[in-house]
Amino acid sequence: VLHSGRPAQDFVHTIPGYQGKCAAWLDVPLQDGKEKFLKPGYERRAEAISIAKEVKRIADSCGPSLSIGVISFYRAQCDLILDALADEGLAEEEDGEIRIARSYRQTESGDERLRVGTVDAFQGKEFDVVFLSVVRANDVVVPDQKEGEERERLLNGKYGHLRLANRMNVAMSRQRKLLVAVGAKHMAEGPESEEGVPALAAFLKLCREEMAHGR
């Protein structure tokens, strides 16, 4: 079960498209493209593009008063997201690296406005809105008859770093107002996900409950 530990009024906001919500799932279905394995990690281009477009929309709608963080469990995905943000004008090349564009680096109060990084880069930090790039998107099936170490191996193969409970906890607790998971929704559906990635499955359930209550 997911608990924020903070009062509901802390999450009140008027972010366009998410009014009244503290949790949302932006579905990027499997047919938009599977995960791609790159030693030592994974990336998914369709997710990176979706995130960049949504970050651009929200950043420009809400202006420099709103801070946004984009988290992935994979460094390769962070690099893809930065490239996609560059395509949207939110990042630029500087000293041979892609970095957040100067005009998007600070909020009007002087805080960091936009950050992209792995979970480690978000330790101890909070942003008004956080996008979590799920990355893992596959059609791997874990047969019911598989048990013990073999079952764990198959679940690890399907979900990867999403199974690291401590990192998932950090990733899901960096937002002040809104957390948006971006990825293939089916990866958080069904008994397999409840066993393999319980926090992600619970988050999708929360998103659906908010939708059902008209929030």
Identify the meaning behind each predicted range.
Residues A48-A52, C78, V116, H161-M172:
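Amphipathic alpha-helical transducer elements in NTP-driven molecular machines
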Residues H3-A86, E97:
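Conserved helicase/translocase motor-coupling segment
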Residues G20-A23, D111-E112, E126-V129, Q175-L178:
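Short glycine-/polar-rich loops that comprise or flank the Walker A/P-loop
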Residues G96-V130, A137:
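Conserved motor-coupling elements within RecA-like helicase/translocase cores
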Residues R75-C78, A121-Q123, R136-V140, K177, ...:
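Conserved nucleotide-binding/hydrolysis micro-motifs of P-loop NTPases
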Residues V142-R215:
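Helicase C-terminal subdomain and adjacent C-terminal extension
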Residues A24-L26, G117, F131, V180-V182:
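Hydrophobic/aromatic beta-strand patches that form the interior of the parallel beta-sheet core
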Residues I71, F131-S133, M172, V180:
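Structural motif
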